[in-house]
Amino acid sequence: MAEQNILTTPSPNADTTIVPPGSPHTHTEQPSGGHGGAFPPFESHTFLAQLIWLALAFGLLYYLMSKVALPRIEAILGDRAGRLSSDLNEAQRMKAEADAAGAAYETSLREAQAKAQAIAQETRNSLSAEADAKRKTLEAELNQRLAASEATIRARTSEAMGNVRTIAGETASAIVERLTGQAPDQASLNRALDATPAVH
C-alpha cells in the first residue's frame, strides 16, 4: 500500500502540528492556553465585503424609506396640515361670526335702551299732561263750588239779614208801643233801622 502525503493550508491563527508520513493519524490542535481569532467585523480582509453589504443595506433601506415610509409620512403630515388649516379657517370664521353677533347684540341693546328711555320719557310726559289736565279740572270744579258756596252764603246772609231787619223792626215797634202806648209809624221805624249799624 503506497503512502500519500497530506498537504494542508494552515489557518493564520491556528497552531498546526505536522505529523510525519507513515503516522496513522493526523491531528490539528490548539494550545490549551491560546485565544480564539479576532471579531469578524474587525478582520481587515472582510472590510470590502462588509462595505459592500453596508452599501446594499443602506440602498435598500433608502429605497424602502423613499417608496413606502416617506410617502406615508408625507401624506400624514399633509393631512394634518390640511386639518390644521381647516380648523384655523373654521376658528377664524366662528370668531368673525361671534364678533358680528356681539356687535349686533350691542347695537340691539343700545336700540332697546334708547326705546326704553323714549317710552319712559313719553310716559312721564303723558302722565304729566294728564296730571295737569286733572289738576286744572279739579281747580275749575273747586272754583265753581266755591263760587256757588259764596253765592249761597251771600243769599242766605241777605235772607238772614232781611229776617233780622224784619224781626228788629217788629221788636222795636212793640217796645215803642209798650212804652208810648201807640205804635210808631213805618217811616220812622225804617229811619231808625237804617241808622242802626249793620251787624256782620
Swiss-Prot record:
Domain of life: Bacteria
Keywords: ATP synthesis, Cell inner membrane, Cell membrane, CF(0), Hydrogen ion transport, Ion transport, Membrane, Transmembrane, Transmembrane helix, Transport
Transmembrane segments: 46-66
Intrachain S-S bonds: none
Hydrolase listed as a keyword: no
Main location: membrane
Residue spans of biased composition, Polar residues class: 1-16
Topological relation to the membrane, as annotated: Single-pass membrane protein
Region entry Disordered, spans: 1-38
GO MF term set: proton-transporting ATP synthase activity, rotational mechanism; proton-transporting ATPase activity, rotational mechanism
Any single Gene Ontology cellular-component annotation: proton-transporting ATP synthase complex
Subcellular location: Cell inner membrane
Family classification: Belongs to the ATPase B chain family.
Classification via PANTHER family: ATP SYNTHASE SUBUNIT B, ATP SYNTHASE SUBUNIT B', CHLOROPLASTIC
Primary role: F(1)F(0) ATP synthase produces ATP from ADP in the presence of a proton or sodium gradient. F-type ATPases consist of two structural domains, F(1) containing the extramembraneous catalytic core and F(0) containing the membrane proton channel, linked together by a central stalk and a peripheral stalk. During catalysis, ATP synthesis in the catalytic domain of F(1) is coupled via a rotary mechanism of the central stalk subunits to proton translocation.
Cited HAMAP family: ATP_synth_b_bprime
Protein name: ATP synthase subunit b 2
Gene source species: Methylorubrum populi (strain ATCC BAA-705 / NCIMB 13946 / BJ001)
Taxonomic path: Bacteria, Pseudomonadati, Pseudomonadota, Alphaproteobacteria, Hyphomicrobiales
